[in-house]
């Protein structure tokens, strides 16, 4: 037990329990302590050492937890159990259930004096908000935690979360600043700092600072190799793959991604390994279309992983949409439509991007089957989603995809309109 900080509350609890037990200060003190020492502790003028607090808890027949925090050992166990269940729900992909549990925990008055436990619950609630697509709410909580005293690991985790949340919210300057300022304070690289650096890379891509991204990824890879830990190697190589892809180095991208996946698989299962298999499959489909069968192998493995370990509906839907793409490329159009429909069924209403992709895949498959009416219907549904999409940079990509699908269906007017929408979304 670390040295206990001087606290009026600790002294008040000792005084309250002593009186409840019908003891005088002298009776509580005898024979190990002086009554004047007890008086100083109760008035908050003296900080009791850990050993003294343990002694007083024994003599008062109460828990050390109560003297320290104002909650009994049983109440502390209940709080820790509630936190564990909330964390487990979040880990299992049950974001809405986790959010409810964290909110209920933070409403418990017994949590008030338990700073570390409260901070853990607030971190959890912020992560749950993010998993529910509620970025603004998550940012508010993390910003509030910025003003508190946190461990080094928590400071890095907070910076990583804010960097990611600012990025997906389009606040790119803040995304870069929060990560760069935290990285600047490091004395040496660690796994956590490499992961923060990997998150910063994504902000560089979004900002269009690809030269800085290429320079920084080299530094990040060197740091990961020097550390030699699986955690650092996966983070650095995985994000190096994205950087290589964004800068037009497709071969490098696939090599980095496969290296990251190999390290991840070698060091045991992870809930992220399924999503990693899907991404590697996507790279094969886009960069090496002649190896579609290889991509399907990765997708089959991903679906197996998702069936054996927790996965979000988003992750499972994404795997099915990539499988639909692979089946279209292989000419198995009925199977492609089936996988796209499965993906759509799994998607939450907020998943605009994947919903657009699903409708475009179905439209393309129907078009290749010469089912013009069904193809046009799916294309129309994709366009409806695109009209509501807030992120212009992503809308550009999908308007171009809609234009290509319109051309496939022989709808030249629709293709021209979609190209114009793409240019407008790009600000041209």
Predicted stretch roles:
Residues 103-110, 143-148, 180-187, 217-229, ...:
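Amphipathic alpha-helical segments of tetratricopeptide repeats
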């Amino acid at each position: 037990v670390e040295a206990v900080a001087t606290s009026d509350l600790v002294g008040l609890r000792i005084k309250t329990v002593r009186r409840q037990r019908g003891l005088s200060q002298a009776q509580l003190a005898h024979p190990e302590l002086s009554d004047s020492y007890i008086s100083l502790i109760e008035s908050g003028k003296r900080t009791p050492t850990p050993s003294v607090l343990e002694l007083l808890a024994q003599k008062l027949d109460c828990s050390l937890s109560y003297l320290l925090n104002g909650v009994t050992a049983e109440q502390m166990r209940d709080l820790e159990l509630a936190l564990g269940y909330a964390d487990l729900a979040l880990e299992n992909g049950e974001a809405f259930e986790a959010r409810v549990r964290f909110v209920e925990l933070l409403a418990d008055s017994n949590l008030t004096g338990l700073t570390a436990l409260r901070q853990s619950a607030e971190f959890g609630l912020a992560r749950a908000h993010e998993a529910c697509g509620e970025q603004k709410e998550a940012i508010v909580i993390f910003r509030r935690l910025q003003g508190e005293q946190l461990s080094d690991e928590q400071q890095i985790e907070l910076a990583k979360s804010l960097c990611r949340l600012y990025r997906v919210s389009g606040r790119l300057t803040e995304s870069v600043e929060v990560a760069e300022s935290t990285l600047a304070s490091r004395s040496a690289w660690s796994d956590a700092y490499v992961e923060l650096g990997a998150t910063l890379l994504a902000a560089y891509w979004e900002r269009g600072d690809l030269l800085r991204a290429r320079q920084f990824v080299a530094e990040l890879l060197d740091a990961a190799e020097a550390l030699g830990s699986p955690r650092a190697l996966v983070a650095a190589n995985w994000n190096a793959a994205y950087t290589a892809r964004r800068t037009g180095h497709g071969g490098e991208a696939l090599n980095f991604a496969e290296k990251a996946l190999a390290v991840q698989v070698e060091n045991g299962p992870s809930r992220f390994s399924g999503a990693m298999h899907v991404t590697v499959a996507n790279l094969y489909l886009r960069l090496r279309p002649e190896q579609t069968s290889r991509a399907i192998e990765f997708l089959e493995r991903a679906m197996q992983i998702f069936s054996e370990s927790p996965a979000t509906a988003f992750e499972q839907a994404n795997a099915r949409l990539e499988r639909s793409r692979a089946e279209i490329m292989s000419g198995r159009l009925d199977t492609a439509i089936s996988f796209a429909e499965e993906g759509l069924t799994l998607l939450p209403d907020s998943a605009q991007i994947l919903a657009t992709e699903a409708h475009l895949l179905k439209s393309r498959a129907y078009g290749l089957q010469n089912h013009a009416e069904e193809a046009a219907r799916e294309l129309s549904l994709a366009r409806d989603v695109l009209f509501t999409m807030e992120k212009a940079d992503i809308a550009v990509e999908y308007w171009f995809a809609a234009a290509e699908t319109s051309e496939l269906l022989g709808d030249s007017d629709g293709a021209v309109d979609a190209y114009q929408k793409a240019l407008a979304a790009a600000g041209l």
